[in-house]
């Protein structure tokens, strides 16, 4: 009798907390996010402390400011996508030390991870107001964040190459 009861209980519980595969579109955008996140974090760790102040020309951001800008944007954009309040801001203007910028980058990517964690297929397709004209889906905003991160990773790659460093995406 116990065997029958346990079998019934297991069958009943199997539907309650059943694993749901992630939405394919969300999983695709998340995979791209993981790629750019890894490259940026590796680059931030790889660059020596003294190069964080490096500017190829006086009128562009320093390498450290680029990392701060990426962190600020991650918080702002992923906050828009998730509907959550950003936990940090002002990083580009307030932080210059490598350890502080690496910590801020890590925190910003963790914040974006939480935006992805709550992104079901239905939620991903909800339209929201964003800083760009028109309306955008939550997932579209996360895709925009990926594009923004890749844009500035490209800047980081150029700065690294100018200083004779091989960026993470080119390392074997």
Give the positions of each predicted feature.
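Bacterial N-terminal signal peptides
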Residues: 3-15
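Cleaved targeting-peptide boundary
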Residues: 13-27
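Short, contiguous alpha-helical
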Residues: 30, 34, 38-41, 51-90, ...
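Acidic/histidine-rich alpha-helical segments that form the ligand environment
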Residues: 43, 95-129, 136-152
């Amino acid at each position: 009798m116990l065997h029958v009861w346990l079998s019934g209980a297991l069958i009943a519980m199997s539907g309650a907390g059943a694993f749901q595969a992630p939405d394919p579109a969300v999983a695709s955008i998340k995979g791209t996010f993981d790629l750019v996140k890894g490259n940026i974090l590796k680059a931030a760790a790889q660059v020596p402390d003294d190069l964080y102040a490096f500017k190829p020309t006086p009128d562009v951001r320093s390498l450290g400011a680029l990392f701060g800008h990426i962190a600020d944007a991650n918080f702002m954009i992923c906050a828009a996508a998730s509907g959550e309040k950003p936990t940090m801001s002002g990083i580009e203007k307030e932080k210059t030390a490598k350890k502080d910028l690496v910590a801020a980058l890590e925190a910003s990517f963790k914040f974006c991870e939480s935006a992805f964690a709550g992104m079901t297929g239905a939620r991903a397709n909800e339209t929201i107001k964003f800083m760009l004209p028109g309306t955008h889906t939550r997932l579209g905003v996360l895709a925009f964040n990926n594009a923004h991160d890749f844009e500035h990773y490209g800047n980081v790659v150029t700065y690294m190459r100018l200083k004779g460093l091989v960026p993470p995406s080119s390392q074997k």
